[in-house]
C-alpha cells in the first residue's frame, strides 16, 4: 500500500474534523455532561436532605405522640382524682344531711317524749287523787291539793 494523495487528504480531513469536533462539538457535550452530573449531585443531595427531614419529622411525630399520650394520661388521672373528690364530697354531704335528719328526728322524739311525760304526769295526778279518794273514802278537793299533786307528778 502506497501513501498517496488520497490517504494524505483523508488524514488532513480527519485531522480537521477532529479539530472542529474539539473546538465546536466537544465543549457543549462536556458542558452537558457537567450539567447532568451537577443535576444528579443536586438530586442526591436533595434526596439525602429529604431523608434527614423525613427522619426528623418521624422523630418529631414520635415525640408529639409521646407527649399526647402523657397528656392524656395526666387528664385521665385528674379526672379520676376529681371523680374521687366528687364522691367524697357527696359522701360528706350525705353524712351531714343524715346527721341533720337524725338530730331533727331525735329532737322530735324528745319533744314527743316530753309531751307524753307531761300527759302521763297529768293523768297520774288525777289517778292519784282518785285513788286517794277511794282509799280515804272521802272527797279530796282537787283545787286545794293541786300543788301537792303537781309536786308529786314532777318527782315522778
Curated annotation (Swiss-Prot):
Principal location class: membrane
UniProt-annotated location(s): Cell inner membrane
InterPro entries associated with the record: ATP_synth_B-like_membr_sf, ATP_synth_b/b'su_bac/chlpt, ATP_synth_F0_bsu_bac, ATP_synthase_B_chain
GO MF annotation list: proton-transporting ATP synthase activity, rotational mechanism; proton-transporting ATPase activity, rotational mechanism
Topology versus the membrane: Single-pass membrane protein
Signal peptide limits: none
Alphabetized UniProt keyword annotations: ATP synthesis, Cell inner membrane, Cell membrane, CF(0), Hydrogen ion transport, Ion transport, Membrane, Transmembrane, Transmembrane helix, Transport
GO cellular component assignments: plasma membrane; proton-transporting ATP synthase complex
Gene3D superfamilies for the chain: F1F0 ATP synthase subunit B, membrane domain (1.20.5.620)
Domain of life: Bacteria
Annotated TM spans: 12-32
Primary role: F(1)F(0) ATP synthase produces ATP from ADP in the presence of a proton or sodium gradient. F-type ATPases consist of two structural domains, F(1) containing the extramembraneous catalytic core and F(0) containing the membrane proton channel, linked together by a central stalk and a peripheral stalk. During catalysis, ATP synthesis in the catalytic domain of F(1) is coupled via a rotary mechanism of the central stalk subunits to proton translocation. Component of the F(0) channel, it forms part of the peripheral stalk, linking F(1) to F(0).
NCBIfam families: ATP_synt_b, PRK05759.1-2, PRK05759.1-4
Family per similarity comment: Belongs to the ATPase B chain family.
Subunit structure, interactors included: F-type ATPases have 2 components, F(1) - the catalytic core - and F(0) - the membrane proton channel. F(1) has five subunits: alpha(3), beta(3), gamma(1), delta(1), epsilon(1). F(0) has three main subunits: a(1), b(2) and c(10-14). The alpha and beta chains form an alternating ring which encloses part of the gamma chain. F(1) is attached to F(0) by a central stalk formed by the gamma and epsilon chains, while a peripheral stalk is formed by the delta and b chains.
Name of protein: ATP synthase subunit b
Amino acid at each position: 500500500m502506497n501513501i498517496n494523495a488520497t490517504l494524505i487528504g483523508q488524514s488532513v480531513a480527519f485531522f480537521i474534523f477532529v479539530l472542529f469536533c474539539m473546538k465546536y462539538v466537544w465543549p457543549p457535550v462536556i458542558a452537558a455532561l457537567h450539567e447532568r452530573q451537577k443535576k444528579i449531585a443536586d438530586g442526591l443531595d436533595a434526596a439525602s436532605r429529604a431523608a434527614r427531614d423525613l427522619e426528623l419529622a418521624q422523630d418529631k411525630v414520635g415525640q408529639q405522640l409521646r407527649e399526647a399520650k402523657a397528656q392524656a394520661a395526666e387528664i385521665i388521672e385528674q379526672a379520676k382524682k376529681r371523680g374521687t373528690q366528687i364522691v367524697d364530697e357527696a359522701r360528706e354531704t350525705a353524712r351531714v344531711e343524715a346527721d341533720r335528719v337524725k338530730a331533727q328526728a331525735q329532737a322530735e322524739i324528745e319533744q314527743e317524749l316530753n309531751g307524753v311525760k307531761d300527759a302521763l304526769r297529768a293523768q297520774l295526778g288525777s289517778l292519784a287523787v282518785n285513788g286517794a279518794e277511794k282509799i280515804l273514802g272521802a272527797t279530796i278537793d282537787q283545787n286545794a291539793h293541786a300543788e301537792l299533786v303537781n309536786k308529786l307528778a314532777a318527782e315522778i
